[in-house]
Amino acid sequence: MPSLWDRFSSSSTSSSPSSLPRTPTPDRPPRSAWGSATREEGFDRSTSLESSDCESLDSSNSGFGPEEDTAYLDGVSLPDFELLSDPEDEHLCANLMQLLQESLAQARLGSRRPARLLMPSQLVSQVGKELLRLAYSEPCGLRGALLDVCVEQGKSCHSVGQLALDPSLVPTFQLTLVLRLDSRLWPKIQGLFSSANSPFLPGFSQSLTLSTGFRVIKKKLYSSEQLLIEEC
């Protein structure tokens, strides 16, 4: 009994090739060339799609045109973004600003009597942000900072104190914060800057509000780099 394959073979051989009508075939490149062209066309389409998708996502995320996007990114530095995701340094900075205000409240600017120096809320915020920014690139962050506090009035600069967030840690960099007294208060505070021979009068003379302007000098204690001075 013939098998199914034998039947198929006999039926196909019985039909003469010459009896079948020939259909004209148009000239076309070989299959390999056609496949290569198809792959290249598909790759070009996918590349175009990916590029347009990225451009669409970028423009929808920023909300600006190409020129506005470039200007926006130029105005934003990497530390500004990283500060938002660093709760430890933000917490340390809040503690440092509290210590700073307490030190200023007991400051002694002259030999006669101490003065209570007050930081406006705007000054507290600006100083905190600047200290965080300067500590961003340090190996221990703000924990490795040694902060010297000075108050400037005219050509004189009076030291208030030195603060360290973590006394058990060897400082990696030093920050000198130079605060300023409002020049309009000078007639009221001239008595605070008397000579050393003047008698000391106990008690606080008055509360003085500091100016919102300040200067920060950064010095790396493990490097010979030049001093970095930030004027705000």
From Swiss-Prot:
Changing K219A: Reduces inhibition of mTORC1. Abolishes inhibition of mTORC1. The modification Phosphothreonine is found at T23, T25. The keyword Ubl conjugation applies. Residues 9-22 have a biased composition (Low complexity). One of its GO terms (biological process) is reactive oxygen species metabolic process. It is found in: Mitochondrion; Cytoplasm, Cytosol. The keyword Ubl conjugation applies. Broadly expressed, with lowest levels in brain, skeletal muscle and intestine. Up-regulated in substantia nigra neurons from Parkinson disease patients (at protein level). Residues 1-71 are annotated as: Disordered. The modification Phosphoserine is found at S19, S121. Monomer. Interacts with BTRC. Identified in a complex with CUL4A, DDB1 and BTRC. Interacts with TXNIP; this inhibits the proteasomal degradation of DDIT4. Regulates cell growth, proliferation and survival via inhibition of the activity of the mammalian target of rapamycin complex 1 (mTORC1). Inhibition of mTORC1 is mediated by a pathway that involves DDIT4/REDD1, AKT1, the TSC1-TSC2 complex and the GTPase RHEB. Plays an important role in responses to cellular energy levels and cellular stress, including responses to hypoxia and DNA damage. Regulates p53/TP53-mediated apoptosis in response to DNA damage via its effect on mTORC1 activity. Belongs to the DDIT4 family. This is DNA damage-inducible transcript 4 protein. It comes from Homo sapiens.
